């Protein structure tokens, strides 16, 4: 059959294999867009100044109204990114870049320690105050922009999570499978003050899950679409170098092993979810 997958060209196969992830990504974006469609405004990731000890320890200061641009090389897209990215480096020096009057200002090796808070209390942190009153008015452009940036932020969260798993900063207890996801959705819904807030929070979680699946499916792991695309690339390279494709039996063997390993991993994660639920 001329329409069978095996008879399609390289790029058409790539598009076919990537289509599922693209639709998941698009679904995540559209859900976030729906959630934000009723927003009145969006918090700007701006600073409200620093603790009294900050300038003495770091040699310079952050002024009220400075916009956070990056934290340790990671771009700040949303208001929530500031505290999230800072929390990943607790106890270690941190590099900050802020925008002041449109110009980038770098603050390297910002010290972690005991600082005075806005109410006079002491706390462990970086001595940076984050503004809560800088708001960007919601309109068609800002809703589209924030929805897109939030979707991209979900992709980064997946990348950072994988990074933490590989480096040992996170373990099996931090992973969730289907049981854990259902449990989280239930918690998100019941913790909300109103039905409208519950629906909004569950939709937000659903959007994050959709983007998560999109990214994970594109990883070059056998049995996933990303693995199939990886094999297509290897085949294409083999054809150009040796005028010969990799035998299909080897690809099938690798995919089978990958599928069994993936199912085993999911089983372990599911058991872990159950133990956490009833433990």
Residue ranges, per PLM feature:
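Juxtamembrane non-transmembrane "cap" segments at the membrane-aqueous interface
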Residues: 223-237
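Conserved PDZ fold ligand-binding element
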Residues: 57-79, 151
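Functional transmembrane alpha-helices
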Residues: 2-11, 48-55, 113-213, 233-257, ...
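Divalent metal-coordination and catalytic microenvironments
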Residues: 20, 217, 225, 254
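PDZ-domain C-terminal substructure recognizer with occasional recognition of PDZ-binding tails
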Residues: 69, 84-122
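Conserved hydrophobic/aromatic pocket- or pore-lining residues that grip, position, or stack substrates
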Residues: 96, 151, 217, 221
């Amino acid at each position: 059959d001329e329409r069978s997958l095996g008879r399609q060209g390289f790029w058409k196969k790539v598009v076919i294999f990537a289509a599922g992830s693209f639709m998941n990504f698009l679904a995540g974006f559209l859900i976030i867009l729906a959630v934000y469609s009723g927003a009145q405004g969006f918090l700007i990731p701006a600073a409200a100044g620093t603790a009294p000890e900050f300038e003495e320890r770091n040699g310079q200061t952050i002024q009220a109204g400075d916009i956070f641009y990056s934290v340790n090389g990671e771009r700040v897209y949303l208001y929530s990114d500031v505290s999230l990215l800072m929390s990943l480096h607790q106890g270690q020096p941190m590099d900050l870049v802020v925008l002041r009057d449109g110009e980038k200002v770098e603050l390297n090796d910002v010290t972690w320690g005991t600082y005075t808070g806005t109410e006079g209390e002491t706390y462990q942190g970086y001595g940076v105050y984050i503004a809560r009153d800088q708001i960007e008015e919601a309109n068609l452009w800002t809703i589209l922009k924030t929805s897109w940036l939030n979707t991209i932020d979900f992709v980064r969260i997946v990348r950072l999570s994988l990074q933490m798993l590989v480096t040992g900063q996170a373990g099996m207890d931090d992973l969730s499978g289907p049981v854990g996801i259902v449990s989280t959705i239930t918690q998100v819904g019941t913790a909300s003050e109103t039905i409208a807030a519950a629906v909004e929070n569950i939709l937000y979680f659903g959007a994050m899950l959709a983007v998560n699946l999109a990214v994970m499916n594109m990883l070059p792991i056998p049995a996933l679409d990303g693995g199939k695309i990886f094999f297509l690339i290897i085949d294409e390279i083999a054809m150009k170098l040796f005028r010969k494709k990799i035998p299909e039996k080897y690809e099938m063997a690798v995919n089978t092993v990958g599928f069994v390993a993936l199912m085993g991993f999911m089983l372990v994660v599911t058991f872990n979810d159950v133990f956490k639920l009833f433990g």
